[in-house]
């Protein structure tokens, strides 16, 4: 309990130093937020203040009108000379990647069989026919 009171007092004194309160009311001079990630030349006004009781932080950030001269039109895509990838091109690229991965699997199995002196059949997965006949819970030996 004492730690919570100490934290509240220290927190209140910190905010009193950051934001001045005069005669129990909000100060007329609000400071710009130091925690803003916006650059200084950004067209935005951010002000912080405390309420009279010191329990609530008030943030004022009105929307600022942007002059028409500072805006840019949205670029329209050229439908005749479109250099962007289409859906079909993306699918073809993915299919080529899959085929190349399948081709890489062949030499890998041959290399494994040479390294461990086994047949190539050991490195291929068993099919569904073999997996169905495998006993999942064989009886325990006595």
UniProtKB/Swiss-Prot annotation:
Q: Mainly resides where? A: mitochondrion
Q: Does the keyword Mitochondrion apply?
A: yes
Can you say where in the cell this protein is located? Mitochondrion
GO CC annotations on file: mitochondrial inner membrane; mitochondrial large ribosomal subunit; mitochondrial small ribosomal subunit; mitochondrion; plasma membrane
Single Gene Ontology BP term? Answer: mitochondrial translation
UniProt keyword Transit peptide present: yes
InterPro entries noted in UniProt? Ribosomal_mL42
Question: What keywords were assigned to this record?
Answer: Mitochondrion, Ribonucleoprotein, Ribosomal protein, Transit peptide
Extract the transit peptide range from the record.
Answer: 1-31
The family assignment reads: Belongs to the mitochondrion-specific ribosomal protein mL42 family.
Q: What is said about its interaction partners and assembly?
A: Component of the mitochondrial ribosome large subunit (39S) which comprises a 16S rRNA and about 50 distinct proteins. Component of the mitochondrial ribosome small subunit (28S) which comprises a 12S rRNA and about 30 distinct proteins.
**Any idea what this protein is called?**
Large ribosomal subunit protein mL42
Q: What is the lineage of its organism?
A: Eukaryota, Metazoa, Chordata, Craniata, Vertebrata
């Amino acid at each position: 309990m004492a730690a919570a009171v100490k934290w509240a007092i220290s927190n209140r004194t910190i905010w009193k130093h950051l934001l001045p309160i005069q005669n129990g009311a909000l100060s007329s001079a609000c400071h710009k937020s130091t925690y803003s990630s916006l650059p200084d030349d950004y067209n935005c006004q951010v002000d912080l203040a405390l309420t009279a009781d010191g329990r609530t932080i008030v943030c004022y950030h009105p929307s600022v009108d942007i002059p028409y001269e500072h805006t840019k039109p949205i670029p329209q895509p050229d439908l005749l000379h479109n250099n962007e990838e289409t859906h079909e091109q993306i699918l073809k690229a993915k299919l080529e990647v899959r085929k190349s991965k399948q081709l890489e699997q062949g030499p890998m199995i041959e290399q494994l069989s040479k390294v461990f002196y086994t047949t190539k059949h050991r490195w291929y997965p068993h099919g569904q026919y073999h997996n169905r006949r495998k006993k999942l819970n064989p009886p325990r030996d006595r």
